[in-house]
């Protein structure tokens, strides 16, 4: 029973979000860490994400059954009823939002609610099924966790929070398009109008390169604006440049498109994990660091 209730919350997604939440939280803390606030933020947002994923599984049952990757989900196989999954999601959401309301800030709660509404109400119920722009809308909800972590400390949506929101939104696009390419047949069978299916893999490849290039520039705004230091800048330059080179390899002749997309996807996770860790530990402004070298 525990396995069913855990699997419906998509633990892999929760773990990925935990890293970005912690990164945003520690970036805003700048070394002055409130451990209880951090625990409440991490647990609260994890439960909110788990809630959204559980309800998404209920909504997506009809398309999950058409996809090889998702047809073994417990809401599809009948191991868990739709009502049980829905109630599970609602309870997790109530507890998660309760923790955020009780222990964090109004700004953090607002963005958690914003991300939840976008993911469940806009993306899952409509955009994913009906529009090629569903990925873009979904990217907004995927970018919320680090902003929640940041705002839990700062209490406001400032330039640092805005950079995180744009940065993580841009990252979501090539990450998601890569999945859609190597899972092309799944999305096609389910009738989901992701860019590779709706407008072709060649256009998706161009978008992947474009988004990574813009993302690499936006990431630099953190050190340029004084939120992170030289170490973060080095990690960002190396990992983002390598990711861009990897994306450009998609234009080689006779390339295995599916294998290439898997590589782009895998490195996207390495990139965002490395940057989340880097911004958590290198929160000193780059200007004083450069002056210290003189």
UniProtKB/Swiss-Prot annotation:
It comes from the Bacteria. One of its GO terms (molecular function) is protoheme IX farnesyltransferase activity. Its EC number is 2.5.1.141. It is a multi-pass membrane protein. It is found in: Cell inner membrane. Converts heme B (protoheme IX) to heme O by substitution of the vinyl group on carbon 2 of heme B porphyrin ring with a hydroxyethyl farnesyl side group. It comes from Pseudoalteromonas translucida (strain TAC 125). Pathway: Porphyrin-containing compound metabolism; heme O biosynthesis; heme O from protoheme: step 1/1. This is Protoheme IX farnesyltransferase 1. The keyword Repeat does not apply.
